[in-house]
């Protein structure tokens, strides 16, 4: 992704393998009901480059991916299926605070039962210009 002279001894690790490792740890060992991945992979590319959409389909135990890098404006989160055919939400809301994202997860008393609602909120300039 970046020429070697610009990253020195930095090691690039496979984001899908790392995401799956830590999502499993959070879900199974720490018993988290909700696992959120903050990503800067980019929403989607024309080729098979790793992106938020690829991560969603190649992952397990992640409920929500909040992404960046490509500055994609989504009106609502995209619903994808992971390797276990479970729903993963992918969301980006652009850049520069133009939009805010809101995703609500409602959990029932029965572990594993949840409802999800998400949307983007357009931020308007509320100050008056002279």
Which functions belong to the PLM regions below?
Residues 1-128:
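Acidic, metal/ion-coordinating pockets
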């Amino acid at each position: 992704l970046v020429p070697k002279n610009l990253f020195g001894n930095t090691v690039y690790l496979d984001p899908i393998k790392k995401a799956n490792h830590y999502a499993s740890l959070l879900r199974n060992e720490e018993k988290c009901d909700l696992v959120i991945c903050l990503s800067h992979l980019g929403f989607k590319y024309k080729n098979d480059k790793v992106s938020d959409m690829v991560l969603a389909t190649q992952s397990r135990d992640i409920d929500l991916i909040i992404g960046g890098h490509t500055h994609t404006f989504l009106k609502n989160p995209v619903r994808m299926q992971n390797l276990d055919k479970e729903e993963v939400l992918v969301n980006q809301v652009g850049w520069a605070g133009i939009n805010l994202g809101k995703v609500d997860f409602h959990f029932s008393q029965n572990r594993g039962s949840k409802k999800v609602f998400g949307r983007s909120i357009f931020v308007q300039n509320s100050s008056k210009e002279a």
